[in-house]
Amino acid sequence: MTTTLNRPTAAAPAATKTKPTFRQRLNVFDVKASPYLYIAPFFILFAVVGLFPLGYTFFVSLFDWHLLKGQGEFVGLRNFTEVLQDRFFWNSLLNTMSIFLLSSIPQLAVAIVVAAVLDQNLRAKTFWRMSILLPYVVTPVAVAMIFTNMFGEQYGLINNILGSFGIDPILWKNETLPSHIAIATMVNWRWTGYNALILLAAMQAVPRDIYESAAIDGAGPFRRFFSITLPSIRPTMVFVIVTATIGGLQIFTEPRLFDPVAAGGTQRQFQTTVLYLWEMAFQRQNFGKASTIAWLLFLIIVLFGLVNYLITRRIATTADGRRRGRTRGRRTGSTTGGESRHHRARQRRNDAVDPASGTPAETVPSTAGTTPRSGL
């Protein structure tokens, strides 16, 4: 009897880890660091023209800062307390909200309609798209001069037209609501075409086969618009709403030029928050309170942005849930319908079998109407 012994194999030598070369290290650094280097100029520029002025404005708001005398004593949050107790600040904020609502809501509605019309197969499409952008190209000063003459109380075009119908002239500059409507009209005329082009670009990105499928299924133009177009451009609508909110809360040029003599009106009936900030800084020369108003306006804009984000997120979540529910319902309906069809087919097969003989009914001879034969 022989016994064979296997010799233990020698352990494999440990793999030596090669040291990466300088070129390899440079390639790894390029892959990891190059994305940050590409976006670094934006953040550097944002820090210089955005974060630094924001922080410096907050620093100024903590002092009794005069335009000519410069930095005064440290007052802490006293400027915030005094501004929040100032009735002129709340009046300007109320005027800003009123003009914002009168301008943003009609502006978005008209922009959607104009974009939907331009999305059709029109002749000279480029001409019409360029035409609606002309009000945005015109300088705000020219727009303010035109609309100031139109809304003139004595010789304005609007009051002359109303007078031809026997309507008394409206005091566009001395009453609160008419002045807000006039300023909102200026804003709408200037920004509606710009927003319409943004919405038009979103509408053109919607696949056309979806509209064709909906038309084949019998959906009309309005049904396709509300069921396909509006849900598809929801992200763009959110962008337009956010930008309109920021611009509406920072409105300055239109109310400033609407009545150049009395900025904001004789009774501050259309003085906005930014216009009140300008008055506090350059007429009262109180940079501390002006910086405080700027910071409060910044916080209000951030609050409005968060509210818009939460509302749009809620709408998107609800729409996705409804879409999944409809899809699940169609799947369940198709499964149930298939089971029902199988059940009906099985029932027909059972009914087609003669219960006495077990043979199919079509093979059983019919004896109806015959008399049995006798054995004779």
Short names for language-model regions:
Residues 1-38, 123-125, 309-376:
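Transmembrane alpha-helical segments of polytopic membrane transport and secretion proteins
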Residues 31-323:
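A structural signal for multi-pass alpha-helical bundles of membrane permease subunits
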